[in-house]
């Protein structure tokens, strides 16, 4: 299983853009893999940008209804909310690295979700921000995602605890 992978807006848009015959199938291949492994991650910012661009700028664009279906499906990718933690982390990144505010928000969202990889075309391919690697999905083949981006599948927590005393409570012995 690959570690969580943050997907920037442009990758989602390329997957819908029939006017990009080279990039569209590559973006689709990445998204298919991330859906299969349940390792895709995004942010509220990405969802907003996707909705606006796929309905207003992409030619031919999607209807608002179809675009919203995509957004709702992507809720399962655990969108990072725009909250105080995200803004604070983005500001730290903006001060430390030569990043725009919007790129700082993307990197911060990926870091807060503990992603190993950020797929984007907007940042330098191969850039490193702490433990986060930036790669272009058009230079890194899905099949080349090896050891640096792999994690052991976490064991699922039990759905319910056994009935009885709350976890961690024990009767005191005298």
What are these regions (language model features)?
Residues 15, 33-37, 53-57, 74-78, ...:
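Alpha-helix C-capping/helix-to-loop hinge sites
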Residues 104-146:
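Acidic, metal-binding active-site segment of PIN/NYN-like and related structure-specific nucleases
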Residues 41, 80-81, 135:
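General small-molecule cofactor/ligand-binding pocket signal
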